[in-house]
Amino acid sequence: MKRTILTAVSLLFLFVLPPHLSAGPRSWQQAQKIAERIGCWAKNSVAPMTPGNVFLKMGDKETAVPLKLTNWGDTEVTSISYTFYYTDKQVSEGPFVLNLDQPLKDGETREVKIPIKPGQKLGKEELLFNITQVNGQYNEASAGYAYLTCCTVNKMPHKGVLVEDYAGMWCWHCPIGLVATDAIARMYPDDVVAVSVHKTDDISKVVSRGVYEGLIDRYAVTVPAVWVARDNKAAGFDITDAFKIEKSKVTYMNMEVDAEWDENGNNIRVKTQVEPCMLPDEGETFAIGYVMTASGLSDDKWRQESNYAEYSSDSYKDAPEEMKFYADAANYVEGWSQVKGMVYNHVAIESQGMDNGLEDSKMTDFRADEVKTHSTTFEGVNKYSVIRDRSKIEIAAVLFNTKTGKIENAARCSVRNHGTTGIRPNLVQEQKKTEGIYDMQGRKVNGKPTPGIYIVNGKKTVIR
């Protein structure tokens, strides 16, 4: 349900202020002055934003839930009083008082933490959060309330975000997508599941012919195309906002993936575990798709179309550090339009069921505390000679909600040696750190490095 806050200031912007005053940094103050003259500006007025689903762990005393508050009045806010109303049980609680560490200024929006108790059983419960008083006075906001869906779970879910980059060596715009994907994977290693799909170029010739079959035509009519959970086509070299939006859509379906080489070192055995933190809605069915990816791919013959004049310009001065490779004249050949020495990461080598999950992986009718598993195998991996370093192979597992067609969750893991203990996914700190010195493109540096930024034993280091 869409709820709109209608206040005096919004009416002023629409009907009172002339066009030359209706925008710009002074518009809020101008509207406030006019409202004060005509006596329609509220003094104590705070409205919350609806956060959607919030997760509360059963057994915990309470959970500090983040909520955003906006001060629509002309008085700084030092405290609010609020109540809870559980719509299912028709029970009220409160009032409670929240004293702010710093006053909330007029026009300011700020996130605060509201303690909420979990339910007595797993599942969803609708909660009305209502701000009754501001600074000890009646709350004048026309919509001083917000509806929350409280999800009581047996364990807090972890959400992995699938980021798919479609690229081609023949495309001089594609470095933007490559940089964006590498950067977001570096910035959020515990939360991003990155896959780079190449379209009709030298890499597409040396990976599986069936990789992402049908999906390239659907999602990459033009490239670059960076999709976040296939819901949001992100643009530019910074896709942080798109990532955060998807990350905020918390799932209640946890998943973990584990992979190991077989005894011959040619096949990868994969096992995925799916555990609901609370029971899914009736009729919901889930299925799993898989991608085998490899990083550190390079070839002396490869050339990536680029544009030195573009990527070395001020337009990219705030770009992630990965863009420096394309802004370095030393990497260019063929008249400043192609780069050599590129290292490609997260490349999709082979995939299974990445349209909407494998048929034999479908899962439904979950019971409380039940963990469902699925296994698959990537066979004949040694035939992909483009993979020079087997330690940089990863398996990505993607959980699809087949009822909604949406991606519910994603996870990734490295491939362990046969017979070794499995590792937990999404915990990069548990993975073996790469020894030696590497440049920012992932290439190992032999001999004494020139001054610059390098990865030394897994840590970023400035060598002078």
Feature-to-residue mapping (PLM):
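Terminal processing/anchoring signals of secreted or surface-associated proteins
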Residues: 1, 171, 226, 420-426, ...
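Bacterial Sec-dependent N-terminal signal peptides
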Residues: 1-28
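C-terminal tail/sorting-segment detector
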Residues: 3, 453-464
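Short, conserved sequence motifs used for protein processing/export or organelle targeting and
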Residues: 31, 35, 39-48, 52-55, ...
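Residue-level detector of functionally pivotal "anchor" positions at catalytic/ligand-binding pockets or at interdomain
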Residues: 36-49, 150-161, 414-441
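Intrinsically disordered, low-complexity Pro/Gly/Ser/Thr-rich segments with frequent PxxP/GP/PP motifs
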Residues: 90-120
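Terminal connector regions
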Residues: 120-155, 394-411
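Local sequence-structure signature of Cys/Sec-based thiol-disulfide redox active-site neighborhoods
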Residues: 153-192, 197
